[in-house]
Amino acid sequence: WNRLPGTTTIHLPFELLDSPLPGTTMAHSKENFSGSSSLEGKNGMFVTKLMERELKNFTPDFVARKSVFCFENRMICLGTGIHNSNNEYPTETTLFQSTFQKGKSTILVNGEEEKEIGFKKKLSGTTEKLLSIRDGYNNHYFVKDGNVQIQITKQESRHEKTRAVTQGTFASAWIEHGKAPKNGTYEYLVWIQPTDQELKNYEATQTYEVLQRNDSAHIVHDRLT
């Protein structure tokens, strides 16, 4: 429940995840800047200013500015101004979390195949050296800014309604911002099930250019469209 792909969250233990509002899990933010648009059904964007409510188990000074620019089967994900005072639990941005079947599923980390339950590694992505990950569904992630934790492990959760213990094996990757981050950032590209020819023809860094990435604006130029 902590790691929904694309979200920036404080990783809380299960007992702190329930909504403090009776009858609903929708804790609406006081921040109203959020929206999306599309062009010809092929290109689009989403942007939001994250701001937590002042509620039980929430961190009211948790803020972030997030955007996703979509060009055909590529998504450029940017984050700036990630800030909160929660020094007990870490803040993270999830790349993916997907079910993993031993003997059937594999992931790639910088071109190396990983298929063993218990795999765990921490790597960094930079402008000079992108971190490349492929999930079990042939989606490719290229991290340009961020320290990334990757793992294949058995996880325990709870059924949403009955609270019965549930278990499963998952492959996960997330960008670590640490506890109580100050002006945290991230940048990564998600290439959705690219063909071998697409990967051969273009390097991830060649497909787009970030013109601006700060608290004033997120601006991206896509070179292929």
Give the ranges of each region predicted by the language model.
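Catalytic and substrate-binding regions of extracellular carbohydrate-active enzymes
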Residues: 1-112
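Short, exposed beta-strand/loop patches in secreted or surface proteins that constitute
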Residues: 32-39, 68-69, 122-124, 131-132, ...
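Generic recognition of long tandem-repeat/solenoid scaffolds
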Residues: 46-48, 131-133, 171-176, 218-222
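Secondary-structure transition/turn motif
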Residues: 50-53, 81-83, 147, 154-156, ...
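Extracellular beta-rich ligand/substrate-recognition surface
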Residues: 53-59, 163-166, 175-181
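Trp/Gly-enriched beta-strand surface patches
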Residues: 113-174
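Short Pro-Gly-centered flexible turn/kink motifs
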Residues: 181-192
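Non-catalytic terminal regions with compositionally biased, polar/charged low complexity
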Residues: 191-225
